[in-house]
Amino acid sequence: MWKSIGELSCDDYVKAGLTLEDAKEFDKLVSDVITKAIETDPRDQWKALVDESVLKPWHPHPLHQLLYYSVYSNWDSSVHGPPLYWFPSLSQSKSTNLGKLMEYHGPRLLGPSYKNPLESFELFRRFSVEHPEVYWSFVIDELSLVFHTPPRCILNKSKPEGTWLPDAVLNIAECCLMPSSHPKKEDDSVAVVWRNEGFDDSPVNRMTIKELREQVMLVANAISGSFEKGDTIAIDMPMTVDAVIIYLAIILAGCIVVSIADSFAAKEIATRLKISKAKGIFTQDYILRGGRRFPLYSRVVEAAPSKVIVLPASGTELHVQLREQDVSWMDFLSNAKPHSSGENYYRPIYLPVESVINILFSSGTTGEPKAIPWTQLSPIRSACDGWAHLDVQVGHTYCWPTNLGWVMGPTLMFSCFLTGATLALYSGSPLGRGFGKFVQDAGVTVLGTVPSLVKTWKRTNCMEGLNWTKIKFFATTGEASNVDDVLWLSSKADYKPVIECCGGTELASSYIIGSPLQPQAFGAFSTPSMTTRIIIFDENGVPYPDDQPCTGEVGLFPQHLGATDRLLNANHDEVYFKGMPMYKETRLRRHGDIVKRTVGGYYNVQGRADDTMNLGGIKTSSIEIERVCDQADECISETAAVTLTPPNGGPELLVIFAVLKEGFKQQSGEELKMKFSRTIQKDLNPLFKVSFVKIVPEFPRTASSKLLRRVLRDQIKQELLSLRSRI
């Protein structure tokens, strides 16, 4: 139990890590600030402490905890909503991308109801939901889009999901590479900054738009010499500057990128190559991470691709022996067709806006990953989300440690190149100080994370002494945030906001998110994204009123720019629409999350409506986990996999229930935990980790023998709570 802020004394500050002398000064400073606000709302007290910079990034974390939790010690979230920690000022709001747009168009669109970006945000957001074609006509003009053939209109409403930018023809990669007057992108503008692990004291590398364009066109020429227009070409490598060049070059050449994460086992790579019918794959000989070298080419070859183009992880020479049909990066580039001018020029292949440019994968509940096609609309949606909700703009440097195999890789790239921001890449492990120093040295202004990454930084204290004060916004996605972890993160940049993002590969966007025009609460989403209408409904499909606190499954209105209208290996209608409730004569689109709407209109994601799991930000299924665990040892009769959210929030924990066969050597829970972990990491993903194993005599089932994972989840939750209370 925390004391109230008025009860804190010098002794409390000493216990939190200050020297006695510093504690006396700090006590006086806190008293001076709080005295002025002692009778006010705790939100005003916290705002005053932050505005006066009472807490510094270099203060020990227990001190930050002490003040935050003491200010809100008597706060009742069920009455007042979640405690807030960041409050945008009016001047800040008017300088944001969305704030400027609102100031310019708001009075005309909303009439006398329009006040300013802070007071009128929700009104304007609802306008964007009701009139998406008006909103998108404004925001699309803010991106560096170049249409070879302009769209006939913004939205044709003849179908339930609409047809967006009908008849438009373009090449979205070209839009990333060409100068523009608005946003202001010039040939000498910095497009990419990067640093390789192990060179932490070296200057940050820089590449201008012109240099990036020339490199992409060189590779596009080489691709045209080896592949045909429309071919699917995979990328399985870390998100280096070379990977970005290859990605854009594939699209510039009229081919389709197949995104494969560099963490996948050979079997998973093979599955994705087969589904996408990939004609070739770009990869590296090794992955360099944390001072170690991990084989990658050998893993890719085990997946039996038809052709591999192999880049060296460092230097110019490969450190592997290639198969006869495979080719080194340097030899591949030497086959590029030179342009008549002698320069690295390539004429882009222009395609309709609905053409597929990228195949990404998301695990479903059947064990086979869903092949999700991104069209040229998808990057537009992704970039617009970054523009509106993370305020990504010219002059900003945007970094998010990720991979082109996950949706955040392309999202990050297009959010930079279509808004005029600079893309920041660190080639190496983001877990240590080297990454943090790169964030400092590159002048990163928008830093994306996942909760498990933040937890590691906080636990190891590896970022101590670094200057992250240039950061304007943090972002986090993939899994639920732990409040104390994001308190730590925000404090490292003078309490800048951590924008929570929740969406999906199939949406090319978030559906709930934070906003620079709203106060933010740790671990909570403050709004549906611009133009997005969400409905929360109960177990009978009955929708809750929009302004009512509630918990239920979320459904999306189908008219969502950038969302998929097809899957390559599954029935799109069955996956996203079948069985969903109707709302105002419209069939809602399934996303599958259970969402809680709080008092005050904030949101928390409570888990999945089905048995899909979220492990370290990677969606997988109970069935897929169980399939490999069933083969982990001959004593296994059957297994059931569930996830559990820790009591204090944070990433989901993987729990395996096991029924053992009779007549075999009995195994302990710890022995099985090691075997399950090894099997899962070998056959599914090396990033997955088993937290608990529970041996049971049988599983609870329905009358039709359907496994009741929910009952198992509740059972282990109660056991852990009971154990915790005894401790």
From Swiss-Prot:
Keywords: Fatty acid metabolism, Ligase, Lipid metabolism, Peroxisome. GO terms for biological process: auxin metabolic process; fatty acid metabolic process. InterPro entries: ACAS_N, AMP-bd_C_sf, AMP-binding_CS, AMP-dep_synth/lig_dom, ANL_N_sf. Disruption phenotype: No visible phenotype under normal growth conditions, but plants are resistant to 2,4-DB. Its EC number is 6.2.1.-. GO terms for cellular component: peroxisome. One of its GO terms (molecular function) is ligase activity. Its main location: other. Pfam families: ACAS_N, AMP-binding. It comes from the Eukaryota. Expressed in flowers. Belongs to the ATP-dependent AMP-binding enzyme family. May be involved in the peroxisomal activation of 2,4-dichlorophenoxybutyric acid (2,4-DB), a precursor of active auxins that inhibit root growth. This is Probable acyl-activating enzyme 18, peroxisomal. It comes from Arabidopsis thaliana. The lineage of its organism: Eukaryota, Viridiplantae, Streptophyta, Embryophyta, Tracheophyta.
